[in-house]
Amino acid sequence: MTQQYQAVILAAGRGSRLGDRTKEIPKALLPIGPRSLTDRTETTFLRRQSEQLYAAGVKQIVIVVGTLKQQIIDDVKRWDIPVTLVENPTPDMGISGSLHSFQYAVRSPHGILDGRMQTILADADIVYHRDVLKTLLDSPAQSSLLVCHRTSGDNEEVRAYGSESRPRFLGKGLTPALVGGEPCLGEATGIVKFAPQDHVLARDTINWMVGDPDAEEGSLRRRGYSPARMATEHEELTQRFMRYGRMHCVRFGQELPFMECDDAREYARVRESFYPSLLAMEGNPGKQASAAS
């Protein structure tokens, strides 16, 4: 990795689709298993991803917290890596989307999207092989969507369509007609890179979509122009960058396991099979990616 990176992990959401599991604990802090085959300390979605980013050379890691924030604040104090926390203070997280959370990081005093470094934006509820990050970190210095070539056919998957140099569509449940016959590139991982040359455009687009807090009270610009306004998800920013012709696609294959956890069924799979197989693969580089099947 020759470029400097910063990362923002979005951990403010409620995780309501996991039912009772997330009534008392943030989704990002749900346990997934041991840190490694040799360190049996229980880790979580959030801790594993933060430690992976730091081990890969990303030295500035910002985590956006919201729901049950104090638990995350207390948990990160026990970690061996430096992270910075930014709060999304919206009282009702049901009306605050992931792009709104990202805006709080961007407007914080921590230099996010200030043109100095490549900026990684990542969901908190994902688990992947450590080499997945290397695929993105070693890619050209241009704004890029990280995509897993493998797809399951599940309509819950967010898939990208187009070409690697010009992805055009991003979304769930898209049919060939809705993407103009563009080929499927794979499942979007929830990890996006914004290059320094695109930071001003990204900041302006975020303010345009979810609302500019510096605009006049009651104005359209203050409320935002995206249909969902504050509830806009960060994938809409990526889709907008596709329209600008500023987004590229970086892909990895099924040899590197990746999984997003949306609901209780998927969480059970992470715990029972996916993550144990992933750890075994990381401990034995020659092992095939059975966890990804």
Regions found by a protein language model. Give the residues of each.
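N-terminal glycine-rich phosphate-binding loop and ensuing alpha1 helix
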Residues: T2-Q70
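Conserved alpha/beta core of the MobA/IspD/sugar-nucleotide pyrophosphorylase nucleotidyltransferase superfamily
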Residues: Q3-A7, P183-S293
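Residues at the starts of beta-strands that form the adenosine-phosphate
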Residues: Q6, K59-I61, P82, Q118, ...
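Active-site glycine-centered loops adjacent to acidic/histidine catalytic or metal-binding residues
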Residues: G13, D125, D263
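Phosphate- and divalent-cation-binding pockets in alpha/beta enzyme and binding domains
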Residues: R17, Q71-D74, D131, L201, ...
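Conserved beta-strand termini and adjacent loop/short-helix elements that scaffold enzyme active sites
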Residues: G66, V86-N88, Y104, V250-G253
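Conserved beta-loop-beta/alpha segment of the NTase-like Rossmann-fold superfamily
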Residues: I73, D80-E164, A280
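Conserved core of the sugar-phosphate nucleotidyltransferase
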Residues: Y128-L220
